[in-house]
Regions:
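Short hydrophobic alpha-helices at membrane interfaces in multi-pass membrane enzymes
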Residues: 94-99, 135-154, 194-195, 392-397
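Extracytoplasmic loop-helix module adjacent to an early transmembrane segment
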Residues: 6-45, 56-61
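Short hydrophobic/aromatic helix or loop-helix immediately within or flanking a transmembrane segment
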Residues: 42-76
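Perimembrane helix-loop-helix junctions
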Residues: 166-204
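Membrane-embedded, lumen/periplasm-facing catalytic core of multi-pass transferases
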Residues: 210-251, 407-502
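Signature aromatic-anchored transmembrane alpha helix within multi-pass, membrane-resident enzymes
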Residues: 191-204, 382-416
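Membrane-interface alpha helices of multi-pass inner-membrane proteins
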Residues: 145-163, 172, 200-209
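Transmembrane-helix motifs of polytopic, lipid-linked glycan transferases
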Residues: 75-92, 321-329
Length: 576
């Protein structure tokens, strides 16, 4: 039944909803995996363990037209939800189990399926595999189930290792409570405890071992090692809070970073390894971090930020509240456990607000982990009478019906895309999808894979392979990737004459090779070359680039518009 429920749900999503990547990171990694940068599938997936890349690689050789990167993420979400569903069907009576499964798949499953994002996929696999793995150990379930769920948990850490720091807090809470229960039981538990510790220990060792293998795989290649180090420094700058150049001016001046240089870093325009060297990027990141430690964030300001974020209105938060109320109603003697789960979840939320790393995918991870933890402690309701059981089953039915009605709303796609043409396509995407780090309920119904597309700019690039096109991050990174259907793999070498000016692929070895092919190893300086063009529709970032060239290389540098296609402006820069 677990397979049947989740199959029906996934098929309905595939038939009626517009599946897309929530953030551009997934698109870039799928492009790398397909061989768009270079001439063959590449398992170096930046944020994802290289072992996952090796797992996908054979499929790209067998059927290179299909985006196996997306298919495998959808499959992992499906198996994770199915495992949780299986556990609940084993623990609860059928009506109650179906109710919590429907609540799970409508609140969390639709989110993970429609807006695919690797962090959400990872937390689903780690928590789904983790709680069923723990349950199977304590309940002495078949070894096959333990191996299956342990593997699921492991694959989740391959997708995004860092989710274990969120999942770990909730899984630790489950373990503490389970061991406490075990010690309170008057049974011979020594062998059972040893078996649990050994099984969990083996899984933990394998997880850490795979992470170490990933680190080794990058470190053994000097180019990939440099890429990882540069990416770390880049992330420490662009992901940090921005208090303005004035806050760091004194220290930045000491390392010869002007206000425009600083803005270039912040606006993802650090495409010059000579000036934006690894050493200077690290020093800049350290200056920002040092200043951050001197800034005090009051409790009132922190709570106000949480309130204005509107977390309490997220469907995933409401689902956790509904599950908590149900749990307290059914099992009044276990309200302490549910309170503990909420405390752990709130601590995580406060922590991420404190470090100012507030994005929806992290909030999703926290609420999913909370939901799974609350779900784990649900037990079959044994009413005092048949009438009592009937009343609760009636309530479950109401919840199931409400969830299904709300789910059906997602199956009614927004048709505003039909009014969009090639010229207004860019504005349409920017309006609804640009702020991918925030929750927007419209995005689940908005359609990006149908209707008119801005293929004019892509055709221009494709038809001029002798030219190198550098795409400004602010202009293209958050919008242009919607022009490709996520189910289709990009052809090998598709990006061999177009690169993001600076972004998560900066100093990626295959990208550096493309730059080398056009003798543009320093992209900023190379903008004045005859065969290098800039796609930039933001006057502010364009002016920053021109000013950078004037400050560092060409005092009389200037930019002229070359073409404008579908709202994308192509510029040619000159020395004078």
């Amino acid at each position: 039944m677990a397979v049947a429920i989740n199959s029906i749900f996934l098929i309905s999503i595939l038939l009626f909803c517009d599946i897309k990547y929530e953030v551009s990171d997934d698109f870039v990694m799928s492009a790398i995996m397909s061989g768009a940068y270079g001439d063959k599938p590449n398992p170096h997936l930046i944020f994802i363990n290289i072992l996952w890349g090796y797992l996908l690689q054979p499929f790209y050789y067998i059927l290179p037209q299909i985006s196996w990167y997306l298919i495998f993420q959808l499959a992992l979400c499906f198996f994770s939800l199915t495992m949780i569903s299986y556990m609940m069907l084993q623990k609860l009576d059928r009506v109650m189990a179906i109710m919590v499964i429907v609540l799970l798949v409508t609140a969390f499953g639709s989110d993970a399926y429609i807006l695919v994002q690797f962090t959400k996929t990872a937390i689903l696999a780690v928590m789904g595999g983790g709680i069923v793995f723990v349950w199977s150990l304590f309940e002495k379930r078949p070894l096959k189930l333990q191996l299956l769920t342990g593997t699921l948990c492991l694959l989740g850490t391959w997708i995004r290792f860092d989710v274990i720091y969120i999942a770990g807090g909730f899984l630790l809470l489950i373990l503490v409570i389970e061991f406490f229960r075990l010690f309170r039981s008057n049974r011979n538990i020594k062998k059972h405890i040893i078996r649990i510790i050994c099984s969990g220990g083996i899984l933990l060792v394998v997880v850490v071992g795979c992470k170490l293998w990933d680190i080794h795989a990058y470190n053994k290649d000097s180019d990939y090692k440099f890429f990882r180090e540069y990416s770390q420094a880049r992330g420490d700058i662009v992901d940090a809070s921005d208090y303005g150049y004035e806050a760091y001016e004194e220290q930045l001046r000491k390392i010869d970073v002007s206000e425009n240089d600083y803005l270039m870093m912040r606006k993802w325009n650090f495409a010059d390894n000579q000036f934006f060297s690894l050493e200077r990027m690290k020093k800049t990141a350290q200056i920002i971090a040092d200043y951050k430690r001197t800034v005090e964030l009051s409790k009132e300001a922190l709570l106000e930020q949480i309130q204005t974020r509107g977390i309490q209105g997220y469907p995933i938060c409401i689902a956790c509240i509904v599950l908590t109320v149900l749990g307290i109603t059914i099992q009044k003697n276990k309200y302490g456990i549910r309170l503990s789960v909420w405390i752990v979840g709130f601590i995580y939320i406060i922590y991420f607000f404190y470090i100012e790393r507030v994005v929806y995918r992290i909030e999703y991870a926290i609420f999913l982990a909370s939901f799974c933890c609350i779900l784990y402690f649900f037990e079959e309701y044994k009413g005092k009478s048949k009438e009592d059981v009937y009343v609760f089953n009636y309530r479950y039915g109401i919840i199931i019906l409400l969830c299904l009605i709300l789910q059906c709303v997602l199956y009614l796609p927004d048709r505003s895309y039909q009014e969009i043409d090639e010229q207004s396509r860019k504005e349409y995407i920017e309006t609804f999808f640009y702020e991918s780090w925030n929750y927007n309920p419209c995005n689940y119904r908005k359609v990006a894979n149908k209707g008119a597309k801005s293929i004019g700019i892509l055709n221009e690039i494709e038809q001029h392979k002798d030219k190198l096109y550098l795409l400004d991050f602010q202009t293209t990174m958050q919008v242009l990737y919607y022009e490709w259907n996520p189910f289709n793999a990009l052809p090998k070498g598709a990006f061999n004459n177009m690169l993001y000016f600076a972004g998560i692929t900066t100093n990626f070895p295959e990208c550096n090779q493309i730059l080398s092919n056009y003798k543009a190893e320093q992209p900023l300086k190379a903008l004045v070359q005859e065969n290098v063009y800039l796609v930039d529709s933001d006057e502010r970032t364009l002016d920053q680039k021109v000013k950078y060239l004037q400050e560092h290389y060409y005092p009389k540098a200037r930019a002229e518009i070359y073409k404008e296609i579908d709202g994308y402006q192509i510029w040619k820069l000159y020395k004078k």
